[in-house]
Amino acid sequence: MIKQALLSVSDKTGIVDFARELNALGVTLLSTGGTAKLLAEAGLPVTEVADYTGFPEMLDGRVKTLHPKVHGGILARRDLPEHMAALAEHNIPTIDLLVVNLYPFQQTVAKDDCTLPDAIENIDIGGPTMLRSAAKNHRDVTVIVDPADYAVVLGEMRANGNSVGYDTNFRLATKVFAHTAQYDGAITNYLTSLGADKSHQARSAYPQTLNLAFEKVQEMRYGENPHQSAAFYRDLKAFDGALANYVQLQGKELSYNNIADADAAWECVKSFDAANSAACVIIKHANPCGVAVGANALEAYDKAFKTDSTSAFGGIIAFNVELDEAAAQAVAKQFVEVLIAPSFSAAARNVFAAKQNVRLLEIPLGKGVNQYDLKRVGGGLLVQGPDARNVQPSELRVVTRRHPTPKEMDDLMFAWRVAKFVKSNAIVFCGNGMTLGVGAGQMSRVDSARIASIKAQNAGLTLAGSAVASDAFFPFRDGLDVVVDAGATCVIQPGGSMRDDEVIAAADERGIAMVLTGTRHFRH
């Protein structure tokens, strides 16, 4: 039964209303510093911890709650007579509810003008200590670190005579340990990122000790293959527009492969500006098999589907605009696993109401990217920054005698945008705002070029006058000859080969335009 609560929070969201409800339930309120002042100004009866312990705050507030009268009241097991006798001997009442959140360390170090002393002063000591004490003794103490849990605790107290059930206390305790682990991890990440001069501005993006925090969204029936177990975890700092922020409107539970492919589709389609045109991306095995832009979702889908209607079967489809009824009716004619869009019209939802196995994911558009790109290797972890480099037309270097026409330049930029999301070695034929042939994942670039041209031929699409993007340089002229023989009139590639001069000379010999980006987009 909760008789006494200690409240000490940095995030004061909802704390006054919560304390008012506790007071109405007859709970004695203890508090510290700014929280105590806020509660007193709201007219609530509150006792300062310094008055409660008989020991004043000291060292500029560094020592406030580090006192036996606080921690004894939290840690004492109510089922052990010797613990309760010790409390009675030293006149220590129990503290049955602890509400604490911590100094804003991560927000502090995110500021450009932060200094090491600023960071150090925002390392909370008393807060984590109390939280861990309460979480350890969760059988007897309710502990709250998140304002979102205020309503849950109040509901149980009202229903159970000021008591909170063990299951809730256990859940709240695990939340505390996750929170303090993340907090300490953030401190370690920051401190071990500082160089010899301890400069905040010169800190490394890659700390000596890397702590990452994720929370489980779901366990899955299996992983990439049926014999593998799997789960999906969400980054606690997931950026705006991240796949992990999806809302599933209908459909079966997402599988491991669904999520992997959906992420590839969503990241690719987000790279197209919805303010300029609707875009549609169709993904199969993490590779785009059709990408297009159009005046609306239907036009974009029709063009993307034409690239490779065979591979689109059972694929993942993403749009960067609302999916309306017309596009939904076209998509519904095919077998699709997952549909992703910023929103779905009511009419589009009705189209898929009869196809409840189709998974509809709604995700708000956003420009953010993951802080790190991670890849596990045996006994280790490869960590890199995201491939977020977007080349602008003004940055391209024309290296051939013939310059691209304005239309060719548009096609080249489209092709380059798509090639970034195709597994290496990647060759992409494009024209008129759509992919025409995609060659992905081959060990030699010339084979990717051949496959891309064959795919276009199989789809009945002409490559005459098309633009080609290569995610990395052409090591020899053979790949270039393949795409020109197929009908390409312009090529975009990073450059950087020892044989660049030979490849450029071949382009001039064949009468095509070639531009270099200076940026490679390997994707493995």
UniProtKB/Swiss-Prot annotation:
Q: In which pathway does it act?
A: Purine metabolism; IMP biosynthesis via de novo pathway; 5-formamido-1-(5-phospho-D-ribosyl)imidazole-4-carboxamide from 5-amino-1-(5-phospho-D-ribosyl)imidazole-4-carboxamide (10-formyl THF route): step 1/1; Purine metabolism; IMP biosynthesis via de novo pathway; IMP from 5-formamido-1-(5-phospho-D-ribosyl)imidazole-4-carboxamide: step 1/1
According to its UniProt entry, one GO biological process term is: 'de novo' IMP biosynthetic process
Q: What GO terms are given for molecular function? A: IMP cyclohydrolase activity; phosphoribosylaminoimidazolecarboxamide formyltransferase activity
Keyword field: Hydrolase, Multifunctional enzyme, Purine biosynthesis, Transferase
Domain (MGS-like) spans: 1-145
- What is this enzyme's catalytic activity, as reactions? (6R)-10-formyltetrahydrofolate + 5-amino-1-(5-phospho-beta-D-ribosyl)imidazole-4-carboxamide = 5-formamido-1-(5-phospho-D-ribosyl)imidazole-4-carboxamide + (6S)-5,6,7,8-tetrahydrofolate; IMP + H2O = 5-formamido-1-(5-phospho-D-ribosyl)imidazole-4-carboxamide
> InterPro entries, per this entry?
AICAR_Tfase_dup_dom_sf, Cytidine_deaminase-like, MGS-like_dom, MGS-like_dom_sf, PurH-like
Its GO CC terms are:
cytosol
Q: Which SMART domains match?
A: AICARFT_IMPCHas (SM00798), MGS (SM00851)
- What EC number(s) does this enzyme carry? 2.1.2.3, 3.5.4.10
Q: Could you name the domain of life of the organism this protein comes from?
A: Bacteria
Cited CDD domains: IMPCH
Q: Which SUPFAM superfamilies match?
A: Cytidine deaminase-like, Methylglyoxal synthase-like
Matching entries from HAMAP family are given as: PurH (MF_00139)
- What does its UniProt record remark on the domains? The IMP cyclohydrolase activity resides in the N-terminal region.
Q: Which family does it belong to?
A: Belongs to the PurH family.
This chain belongs to the protein called Bifunctional purine biosynthesis protein PurH
Query: What is the native source organism of this protein?
Result: Cupriavidus metallidurans (strain ATCC 43123 / DSM 2839 / NBRC 102507 / CH34) (Ralstonia metallidurans)
